[in-house]
Design a protein with these regions (language model features):
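Short, well-ordered alpha-helix to beta-strand connector turns
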Residues: 5, 43-44, 64, 71, ...
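Hydrophobic "anchor" residues on beta-strands that sit immediately upstream
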Residues: 6-9, 66, 233-234
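Mg2+-dependent phosphoryl-transfer enzymes with acidic/Ser/Thr/Gly-rich catalytic loops
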Residues: 3, 208-298
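Short His-Asn-centered micro-motif
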Residues: 10, 49-52, 236-238, 255
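Active-site phosphate-binding/coordination module
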Residues: 19, 28-147
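Asp-based phosphoryl-transfer active-site loop
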Residues: 4-23, 218, 246
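Glycine-rich phosphate-binding "P-loop"
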Residues: 16-26, 202-209
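Conserved acidic, metal-coordinating active-site core of Asp-based
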Residues: 129-234, 240-248
Length: 298
């Protein structure tokens, strides 16, 4: 049956920009894909659900209506500057980073903001820092990306990333098990709720200050959008942390951007990264009516 899509929710890293062996040009979305996302966002909401923090995503996804960061820990609803002019109480905080928008740095501002469990976040941020220092000392090949909540600048997660190693698949097989043992020793030595997200095939390990998953995060986006049962959601993702979101979407598409990544995804379809732009262009041209993958890809 044809399905009319009302909302698109997408992961960022590995989905809208390829994981590849090396980091892309500033981890940016390729221009042709970004253009179609802007076109779509003028008609229906496009939302981002990412493990990245808002500091990283802010400039890169200005087409998005909702940006759910650090696996749903921090959620932003964005409004265009025009709607801001018409709505006096839209500002989040006086003197906040929001005011940068007025100087033309962004095409939108934050209109709603939610943060999960600030108590746990504060309690565990010091532990994350200690763990980060420990890994940095023991495994010099790994690059560690700290992720901070945007409003208070509290360390909320760390991402251990070794995709810059040319044959990272060997590192994954031979060295990553030792990295995980080191993390486990640290986590078990202290009372804490740190949450370790591992990946079967990706060159990452993510560690969060609390248990988070994209199933809960997508529910929060549905709630913010006030979705009715009739409104159908398309979800795009590339790794096993997207599986809970794939299961909650009406149509789900897994993206492959590196032949070394063969993770089993719970998505309805799988496409190559270079097929995503033509797929979205066709969906846009057909007024967001999806009718079987083969027809959409022609």
């Amino acid at each position: 049956l044809p399905l009319r899509i009302s909302v698109i929710i997408s992961d960022y890293d590995g989905t809208l920009c390829p994981t590849a062996s090396l980091k892309g040009v500033n981890n940016q979305i390729p221009p042709d894909l970004e253009k179609v996302l802007w076109d779509i966002s003028a008609k229906i909401p496009v939302c981002i659900l990412s493990t990245k923090d808002f500091g990283f995503l802010r400039k890169k996804v200005q087409f998005a209506k909702i940006v759910s960061c650090i696996m749903g820990l921090e959620i932003f609803e964005l409004a265009t500057l025009e709607s801001r002019a018409a709505n006096v109480d839209i500002d989040l905080l006086p003197n906040s980073k929001n005011y940068l928008s007025v100087k033309g740095e962004f095409s939108n501002v934050i209109s709603q903001y939610r943060l999960l469990d600030v108590k746990t976040l504060i309690k565990n941020s010091m532990l994350l820092k200690k763990l980060s220092d420990k890994i940095e000392k023991e495994f010099q090949d790994i690059s560690i990306e700290p992720k901070y909540n945007y409003v208070d600048d509290i360390l909320a997660a760390i991402s251990l990333d070794y995709r810059q190693i040319q044959k990272w698949e060997h590192y994954k097989t031979n060295i990553e098990p030792y990295v995980l043992i080191s993390i486990q020793q640290f986590v078990l030595s202290l009372p804490n709720d740190l949450f370790v997200q591992t990946y079967a095939d990706h060159p990452f390990i993510d560690i969060y200050s609390m248990h988070l998953d994209k199933g809960q995060a997508i529910d929060a986006i549905f709630h913010l959008l006030n979705l009715s049962k009739e409104q159908k959601v398309l979800y795009l993702g590339d790794s096993e942390n997207d599986n809970p979101a794939f299961r909650k979407a009406d149509l789900s598409i897994g993206i492959r951007s590196d032949e070394r990544v063969k993770t089993r995804l719970d998505s309805d379809y799988l496409i190559q990264f270079n097929e995503l732009t033509p797929f979205l262009q066709k969906l846009y041209a057909e007024d967001f009516v999806f009718n079987r993958m083969s027809q959409n890809m022609q």
